[in-house]
């Protein structure tokens, strides 16, 4: 018997990511699923834990970690609620603004609680972001193409935004493309973040994919990561659940918990 299991609440358990995460937690010897947040009418009898419709019903639940795999429009409120009630948030929902992340980090420090907002839980995607950060020192001309299933609500993806932000830390100030470039169709060249172009693709059959394409005189470099199914995110989620128990503030990005 394993003592001191980490007690986990899962918000958003009915989604594809959420249902996969629930099974991972149920099968993990060091985790204990203690509650679910979602619509009760859709609950399978296989879940032998309480299910709540409203987060306020969880105020007195005994738990360590709040795993949030909900939707961008509620993720900030959910994360704040978790911290406010002494739970360590592990958040896979994207769409946070820079200001929202800053406020949550500040609040977590006040509460002395660990937490994690991860634009991507796939270890390969985290490595892609770190490799891109190194490559941009030598290849400042770069564009990002992110590809996801057609049910994804936000664009560009949190992974693409995080990749651009990391590259901006190392990329020299640089004008990319023709000075007199004009779009004959608005948006044809994609969105711009930190001087880099991001292109979003949404198609059925895709899960989560990203290319970072670098160009230079006479050569090019393409870095790509593919998640073929949602099991690719479970190692990172499990790592996040364990690691937030060891820190006293919220981190933005799974790379903070890897030896990179």
UniProtKB/Swiss-Prot annotation:
<protein>
    <recommendedName>
        <fullName>4-hydroxy-tetrahydrodipicolinate reductase</fullName>
        <ecNumber>1.17.1.8</ecNumber>
    </recommendedName>
</protein>
<feature type="binding site">
    <location>
        <begin position="158"/>
        <end position="159"/>
    </location>
    <ligand>
        <name>(S)-2,3,4,5-tetrahydrodipicolinate</name>
    </ligand>
</feature>
<feature type="active site" description="Proton donor/acceptor">
    <location>
        <position position="148"/>
    </location>
</feature>
<comment type="similarity">
    <text>Belongs to the DapB family.</text>
</comment>
<dbReference type="InterPro" id="IPR023940">
    <property type="entry name" value="DHDPR_bac"/>
</dbReference>
<comment type="pathway">
    <text>Amino-acid biosynthesis; L-lysine biosynthesis via DAP pathway; (S)-tetrahydrodipicolinate from L-aspartate: step 4/4.</text>
</comment>
<dbReference type="InterPro" id="IPR036291">
    <property type="entry name" value="NAD(P)-bd_dom_sf"/>
</dbReference>
<keyword id="KW-0560">Oxidoreductase</keyword>
<keyword id="KW-0521">NADP</keyword>
<feature type="active site" description="Proton donor">
    <location>
        <position position="152"/>
    </location>
</feature>
<dbReference type="GO" id="GO:0008839">
    <property type="term" value="F:4-hydroxy-tetrahydrodipicolinate reductase"/>
</dbReference>
<dbReference type="Pfam" id="PF05173">
    <property type="entry name" value="DapB_C"/>
</dbReference>
<dbReference type="GO" id="GO:0005829">
    <property type="term" value="C:cytosol"/>
</dbReference>
<dbReference type="GO" id="GO:0019877">
    <property type="term" value="P:diaminopimelate biosynthetic process"/>
</dbReference>
<dbReference type="GO" id="GO:0009089">
    <property type="term" value="P:lysine biosynthetic process via diaminopimelate"/>
</dbReference>
<dbReference type="GO" id="GO:0050661">
    <property type="term" value="F:NADP binding"/>
</dbReference>
<feature type="binding site">
    <location>
        <position position="149"/>
    </location>
    <ligand>
        <name>(S)-2,3,4,5-tetrahydrodipicolinate</name>
    </ligand>
</feature>
<dbReference type="InterPro" id="IPR000846">
    <property type="entry name" value="DapB_N"/>
</dbReference>
<keyword id="KW-0220">Diaminopimelate biosynthesis</keyword>
<keyword id="KW-0520">NAD</keyword>
<feature type="binding site">
    <location>
        <begin position="12"/>
        <end position="17"/>
    </location>
    <ligand>
        <name>NAD(+)</name>
    </ligand>
</feature>
<dbReference type="GO" id="GO:0016726">
    <property type="term" value="F:oxidoreductase activity, acting on CH or CH2 groups, NAD or NADP as acceptor"/>
</dbReference>
<dbReference type="GO" id="GO:0051287">
    <property type="term" value="F:NAD binding"/>
</dbReference>
<keyword id="KW-0028">Amino-acid biosynthesis</keyword>
<feature type="binding site">
    <location>
        <begin position="92"/>
        <end position="94"/>
    </location>
    <ligand>
        <name>NAD(+)</name>
    </ligand>
</feature>
<keyword id="KW-0963">Cytoplasm</keyword>
<dbReference type="InterPro" id="IPR022663">
    <property type="entry name" value="DapB_C"/>
</dbReference>
<dbReference type="InterPro" id="IPR022664">
    <property type="entry name" value="DapB_N_CS"/>
</dbReference>
<keyword id="KW-0457">Lysine biosynthesis</keyword>
<feature type="binding site">
    <location>
        <begin position="118"/>
        <end position="121"/>
    </location>
    <ligand>
        <name>NAD(+)</name>
    </ligand>
</feature>
<comment type="function">
    <text>Catalyzes the conversion of 4-hydroxy-tetrahydrodipicolinate (HTPA) to tetrahydrodipicolinate.</text>
</comment>
<dbReference type="Pfam" id="PF01113">
    <property type="entry name" value="DapB_N"/>
</dbReference>
